[in-house]
Amino acid sequence: MSDAHGVARDQLRAFVERIERLEEEKKTIADDIKDVYGEAKGMGFDTKILKKVIALRKKDEQERMEEDLILDTYLHALGMIENPPEG
């Protein structure tokens, strides 16, 4: 095997091993997050709502306002809310 193939093989192996380590770290973090949700649930918090709060905190105010307006538009169209959205 030529030296170039050996280098490519070593690089490929290094990438695969790095990805495998990161995947394991990701699993560990996901397990930790699950544990925190379990703690919150044990303290009486609604984890479904907690997840929504976390998702909302990831968005900026403008994005949240746009989504709320669209949601209200859909709900109004379906007769689920009375007042049409103000936008």
UniProtKB/Swiss-Prot annotation:
Q: Which InterPro entries match?
A: GapR-like (IPR018753), GapR-like_DNA-bd (IPR046367)
**Pfam families, sorted:** GapR_DNA-bd
Q: Name one GO molecular function term.
A: DNA binding
Q: Which NCBIfam families match?
A: PRK13694.1 (NF010247)
| Family to which the UniProt record says this protein belongs | Belongs to the UPF0335 family.
According to UniProt, the name of this protein is UPF0335 protein Avi_3695
